[in-house]
Amino acid sequence: MKSGSCIALLLLAVLLLTACSAVPKTKDYSVLDPQLDLETIYIVPFDATLVPPDFGDPIFDQFVDILNARRQQTKVGRFVILKEDLKEVEPAWLIKQIYISGDIWGYIETSGCCSTDMKVKSRLYLYEPGKNSPIFEAFIPVEHYFDHDRSDIATERMRLGKKLAQDLAEAVIKKLTP
């Protein structure tokens, strides 16, 4: 009977630990209109609140590079970065475009004597022309752990950023792939 109790306790612990880890979530609010001209999708620079600039800026650049490298999968002609922040873009022009906006936040490094745990969260939104609400939303949390004797924080921060950029791009590509 003790082994059955131990197994049940172990399964409960695994379930609790699994429930605590953040997982990507996507919400489809609408289907992308198949009649839309997908020649250009604009990307508004992400708001990176409480994220080191040397971490947030490269993620955005890598995200756009991945999208453009894989755009043939999506039937999109090109992904173009808007040079202004969202609040500086003319609303009358923006409402007529297909565009992506997003945020990166919650960057945390927890270091001990021998290891570091890193976490960051991001969310992106896809908008259709004429709509004030997104047709698609993706929440992408990324966690990473490493031992100090195997790597350093700068290298692993870059690895975490690349993973986030890849996950963000994958969510968009999946939504836009016919």
Predicted region positions:
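Extracytoplasmic/periplasmic, Sec-exported soluble proteins
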Residues: 51-59, 112, 116-118, 152-164
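A structural "domain/chain start" motif
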Residues: 18-72, 169-178
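C-terminal partner/receptor-binding element of secreted or periplasmic proteins
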Residues: 147-178
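Short beta-strand->alpha-helix linker/helix-N-cap micro-motif
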Residues: 68-93
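Bacterial N-terminal signal peptides
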Residues: 8-18
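Surface-exposed short loop/turn segments
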Residues: 84-135, 144-151, 155
